[in-house]
Amino acid sequence: MPQMDPRALKATSVKAEDEHASSAEPQALKITAASSNPKMFTLPWHKPLATWPEDLLANLPRGISRHVVRFVHVGDEVYAMKEITRQVAEREYEILRRLQKLELPTVIPIAVVTGRHDLNGEPLEAILVTRHLKFSLPYRALFARNLQPDTAERLIDALAVLLVRLHLAGFYWGDVSLSNVLFLRDADAFSAFLVDAETGDLQAQLTDGQREYDIDLARTNIIGELMDLASGKLLPGDVDEIEVGNRLVDRYHSLWSALTDTDKFSPDEMWKIEQRVNKLNDL
């Protein structure tokens, strides 16, 4: 039976409970973090995140989220803060910590803040804190900048690489989309970073069914996101949304096959080894 990478097991730092289980909220403010930033204690945790004062906020492009998200100045750093339930915040913090231990491209988890109450004593949702990835952009901000015509294809290629790396590590995403990724320019290409692990699960090894579910969901979500861009006149007219969605599936399978297929070579078939190395380099 496949064993989980011991690096991931050592990363657990929060006892994350089942999000459907009922348990009492902490009565006092609690900041759980791998390392402390004293400035964290000066923030207005007693206020809903949507009402935090403008002088604390960093004006950075935000992707689409079903939760309240803000970029906040904390000393010399900028943190992304997401307001969610305590169980979900603790679980996502733990998963991100484990993915970081595996040296996978994700945002860096900083803290989870629980036990928040307003001045009237009413409970507020928890906040997950991650470090803002410098120079990164959500996909909508990239398309708003009138980039090259092949931008969509290059973003898809980056997402395919990210998805393969996560799957090889045993991470089932459960909500693959352009919205849950940040992109960094990497010469003429892009690098993709996981930014939302809310629905994810880290296992010793994924089944083919789990991988295919992620891929199929990614294709569906990407086509929908690109159609949304097209309706807002942000997508070049010659881009076929369905073709781009299919490209992710093709690129994923090509890369997965190149990395995981086993071949047998006889001593006089060195050219086959060269051929495989060249294929990996091309991918």
Question: Residue ranges of each PLM-predicted region?
Answer:
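Hydrophobic residue at the +6 position relative to the catalytic HRD Asp in the kinase catalytic loop
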Residues: 176, 181-183
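Juxta-kinase regulatory segment immediately upstream of eukaryotic protein kinase catalytic domains
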Residues: 2-58
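Conserved ATP-binding subdomain of kinase catalytic cores across diverse folds
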Residues: 40-153, 157-174, 221-223, 228-229
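Short, low-complexity Ser/Thr-rich regulatory SLiMs
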Residues: 116, 183-187
